[in-house]
């Protein structure tokens, strides 16, 4: 499935139905009074968050959404039927902005959450409302009131607890494939990841969190260079960032400089990302001996000083250090949720977490088609349990 996280659409609620001009005509009552009914209300335009959606791709093919108008009033004081609301479903985590001034109208963060974007027009009054002592047979009725209209921008931000950042080929996709059932494309060349990937990491049986892997960042990303800049918004909601830096060779360029480059890009994108708790993950450590690892650590300590975040040395190839990292991150996420008042774990909140395929597949029936992913047919759920 193609991934689209931004869209611009036009909304128009339904016009109200017109009032009716009618007079009572029955047997033995040839000149009855006015009995024209009111028009029905036009349909509202309502956004609804749907946990089973994970992209805005549908809005690429349809940009105009118009609700139906209300039915006109009828005689015998019959009010016209109101039109049904037009429900537009969007992924959980979608921000809706007024395109005119960029104002945030709503942040759809819960499955089933609804937002009234455009209210339908009221129906017009029938001529029975205009009867008076001086006008016993009014031939006047109101037209229906017009519905509201506007252009809005939809911006989808994934709901994940942990975000993976780093330069291309730093091992982010490999890590998420090792700690969860996610099966992103993995290859030995830069920019293998072209869109965000989500995975559910289960710690013991009663706690889990969602991890997001975004395309690699390069110098100048916050100015539009590379792919990562377009997806940085997807980690703005994360509680913790894992910054992966590969240390496969001491002859390579300076790993500390690469770390500082990406940190500068995060700060350039937003102060919010710069202030998030983070963990420094030195990846591909199986390619270095213990002495060389300590040399790399000393470089970071000397140049970062007190600003140095917690460090984990790991190898996704051998599994070294992964369990300790998972439990440490799980503890940080749990503490963050307690502060935020979010009790529970990711699987309990699965419908509200961007409708991610990674979350839905855990509870999908075994016969469900899986044609959209050629690499995950043998995927298994990973549950980390201390021995």
From Swiss-Prot:
Broad class of enzyme this protein falls into: hydrolase
Cell compartments where the protein resides: Cytoplasm
Binding-site residues, Mg(2+): 173, 193
GO terms for biological process, alphabetical: ribosome biogenesis
Alphabetical keyword list: Cytoplasm, GTP-binding, Hydrolase, Magnesium, Metal-binding, Nucleotide-binding
Residue intervals of the OBG-type G domain: 160-334
Renumbered residue ranges of the record's region Disordered: 347-379
Chain residues that bind GTP: 166-173, 191-195, 213-216, 283-286, 315-317
Superkingdom of the organism of origin: Bacteria
Cofactor(s) this protein requires: Mg(2+)
Acidic residues: compositionally biased ranges: 368-379
EC number(s) on file: 3.6.5.-
Start and end residues of each Obg domain: 1-159
GO molecular function, one term: GTPase activity
Any Gene Ontology CC annotation: cytoplasm
Keyword hit for Acetylation: no
UniProt family annotation: Belongs to the TRAFAC class OBG-HflX-like GTPase superfamily. OBG GTPase family.
Task performed by this protein: An essential GTPase which binds GTP, GDP and possibly (p)ppGpp with moderate affinity, with high nucleotide exchange rates and a fairly low GTP hydrolysis rate. Plays a role in control of the cell cycle, stress response, ribosome biogenesis and in those bacteria that undergo differentiation, in morphogenesis control.
Quaternary structure (record): Monomer.
Alphabetized NCBIfam families for the sequence: Obg_CgtA, PRK12296.1, PRK12297.1, PRK12299.1
Protein's name according to its UniProt entry: GTPase Obg
Species classification: Bacteria, Pseudomonadati, Pseudomonadota, Alphaproteobacteria, Magnetococcales
Gene: obg
